[in-house]
Amino acid sequence: MQTPTGRLLELLELLQERPLTTGREIADRLAIDARTVRRYVEALQGLGIPVEGQRGVGGGYRVRPGFRL
């Protein structure tokens, strides 16, 4: 079983690999529920990582273009 920290790192890698990732794709990839996706996104934002969310059809999450660790 992966730790929450490991899943946060995996989420960051996923967001940096793709221009836009839906909450469902994140949940499926990390084997978590939608609420946990939102909590993890908030955790990354709290660490100063510029994760942006777009609602609605065609929406999803992304790291602001140009950001790299």
Predicted segments, located by residue:
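Short, basic/aromatic recognition patches that contact phosphate-bearing ligands
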Residues: 1-69
